[in-house]
Amino acid sequence: MEELILGIVQGLTEFLPISSSGHLAIFTAIFNSTPDVGYFAFLHLATFLAVLIFVKSEVFEIINGISKKDKEYINLASKLVLSTIPAVFVGLFFGDFIESVFSSTYLIGIFLSITGILMLLSDKLNKNLKTIKSIPYFDALIVGVFQAFSVLPGISRSGTTLFAALFLGMKKEDAVKYSFLMSLPVTFGAGILELHNVAFSTEQIFGFVISFLTGLLGLYLVKRMVIGGKLKIFGYYCFLASFFVLTFL
């Protein structure tokens, strides 16, 4: 049952800007069990597949453009790779520290508050100047740096990248697309690196399937909320979650 619940939590919260890793750590604390970082990473592969389906047209468009040596798509792919580098660096060199944070509900509560603040600010950002193809390389790097902070449980990956993209003047729909696209190598890498620690029990595989299905729902919801200017709802939720964690866990 625990694996099933964690699968639902991962699927829904991976793309909603409320921190999936933070919620997985919270529910692990509620269950009074040891954080299974390997299983958490396995669930990331489920949400990777959900994103791949959700942005399949953009992925095929990029692959097709690169195969035709279209400079515009080659540049876009290069920017996505650049956005990924900071998170990969942090994951490889600070993995032990990150794993230790999963056991600190106090830090998770603080980080959730930070995510809440970013979501309240995001709704006020509406420059609508740049598309995913027109953003400069420097902007791509900045978004990547923000994503790197999301390796900490409580700091939302989608929340930080959406905030950064909107702050830098990207159109809302393009900010969503860019956030989803740049999540692909990160979630895939996180899953593959820890795959050897997964038991592949029936419960874990079922949790994987549930995480995939709820991930698709989460993707749809966050796209609607960003375009509709309702990210502040997630901000208020993060404050409530932070209060709960700091008070009761």
UniProtKB/Swiss-Prot annotation:
The keyword Transmembrane helix applies. The keyword Hydrolase applies. It catalyses: di-trans,octa-cis-undecaprenyl diphosphate + H2O = di-trans,octa-cis-undecaprenyl phosphate + phosphate + H(+). Pfam families: BacA. Signal peptide: none annotated. The chain crosses the membrane at residues 11-31, 35-55, 80-100, 101-121, 135-155, 180-200, 202-222, 226-246. GO terms for cellular component: plasma membrane. Its main location: membrane. It is found in: Cell membrane. Its EC number is 3.6.1.27. InterPro entries: UppP. GO terms for molecular function: undecaprenyl-diphosphatase activity. Keywords: Cell membrane, Hydrolase, Membrane, Transmembrane, Transmembrane helix. It is a multi-pass membrane protein. Belongs to the UppP family. PANTHER family: UNDECAPRENYL-DIPHOSPHATASE. Catalyzes the dephosphorylation of undecaprenyl diphosphate (UPP). This is Undecaprenyl-diphosphatase. It comes from Methanococcus maripaludis (strain C7 / ATCC BAA-1331).
